[in-house]
């Protein structure tokens, strides 16, 4: 058992070193080349957080090959190959030249790869043998499929209520008008786009944090301590982005504190979802819902006047999400995850 724990720690630390080094180095390079975010470089800085999101899964995949993971089946390698193809092309199109132009701000060629990847994952679920090949790497859609409805609807409702509280309490105002109908219409359109075009970036975070890191932290620390540490790591990973003015503009210190509160609260929900289903895809779906709510909520519900002390992704919003998270912590799914010392 000592050797197993030592191996888990080794895989964990190598993953964290790659993920943090790549993310922080990218931010440093973009800052040195483009400076702080302005109207002239808004596209690059807007896409850089998307690029960040690809690093955790990339680090996880590198570690899986380096440490010769048994989860690297043929089907898994196909998905990983498409993910890396997207990542390489996305970086080239973002920081060098968009080969086929753009869809809005998104590079077109890498978007085509994203659609191809989505269709490939779908097709790999059509045969039992292929699904079996995806299961060890948690790329199979999983079990307890009712949670694909229950949890996304629940988190959407909780966050929507939190966002509306920003408007009701005067902590925020919409950039256009308060209109829930237009919010829903815009959100649905963005979700449709996100599922096909943005899933690789969300997968990038969730496969790294909720699969690779989670599968190593929980056996070492147990479910409760593991999910807390995972949330803290996830929050700290956002530090350079916040220092450079994203997420919580003008709040480099309090912004990082608010982010860590938020990632702990949301991280519990995402980890619970993966533990209940055995699949990364439910975490991808929930994360995508949270991200896709941002633009329509700012337009038709409220933009926070003070991003830290507010509902939504602010501290007040994190408290509301935390109430839901604490309810999930009562589940038995968190128990018996730690390696037994006596074995």
Per-region residue spans from a language model:
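Alpha-helical transmembrane segments of multi-pass membrane proteins
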Residues: 19-35, 91-93, 160-166, 331
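Central hydrophobic cores of alpha-helical transmembrane segments
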Residues: 77-86, 226-233, 282-292
């Amino acid at each position: 058992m000592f050797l197993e724990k030592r191996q888990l720690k080794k895989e964990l630390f190598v993953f964290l070193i790659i993920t943090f080094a790549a993310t922080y180095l990218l931010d440093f390079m973009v800052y040195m080349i483009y400076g702080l975010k302005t109207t002239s470089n808004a596209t690059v800085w807007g896409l850089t957080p998307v690029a960040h999101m690809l690093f955790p899964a990339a680090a996880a995949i590198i570690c899986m090959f380096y440490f010769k993971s048994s989860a690297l089946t043929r089907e898994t390698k196909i998905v990983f190959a498409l993910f890396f193809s997207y990542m390489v092309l996305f970086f080239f199109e973002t920081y060098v030249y968009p080969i086929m132009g753009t869809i809005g701000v998104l590079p077109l060629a890498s978007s085509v790869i994203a659609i191809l990847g989505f269709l490939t994952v779908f097709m790999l679920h059509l045969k039992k043998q292929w699904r079996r090949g995806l299961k060890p790497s948690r790329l199979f859609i999983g079990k307890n499929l009712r949670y694909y409805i229950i949890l996304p609807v629940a988190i959407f409702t909780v966050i929507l209520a939190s966002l509306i509280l920003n408007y009701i309490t005067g902590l925020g105002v919409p950039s256009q008008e308060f209109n829930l109908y237009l919010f829903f219409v815009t959100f649905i359109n963005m979700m449709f786009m996100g599922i096909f075009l943005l899933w690789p970036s969300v997968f990038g975070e969730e496969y790294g944090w909720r699969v690779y890191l989670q599968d190593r932290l929980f056996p070492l620390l147990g479910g409760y301590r593991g999910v807390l540490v995972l949330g803290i790591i996830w929050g700290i990973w956002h530090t350079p982005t916040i220092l450079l003015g994203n997420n919580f503009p003008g709040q480099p210190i309090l912004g990082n504190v608010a982010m860590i509160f938020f990632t702990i609260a949301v991280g519990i929900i995402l980890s619970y979802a993966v533990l209940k289903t055995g699949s990364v895809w439910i975490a991808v779906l929930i994360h995508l819902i949270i991200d896709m709510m941002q633009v329509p909520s700012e337009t038709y519900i409220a933009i926070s006047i003070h991003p830290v002390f507010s509902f939504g992704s602010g501290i007040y919003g994190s408290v509301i999400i935390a109430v839901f998270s604490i309810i999930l912590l009562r589940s038995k799914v968190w128990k018996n995850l730690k390696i037994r010392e006596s074995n």
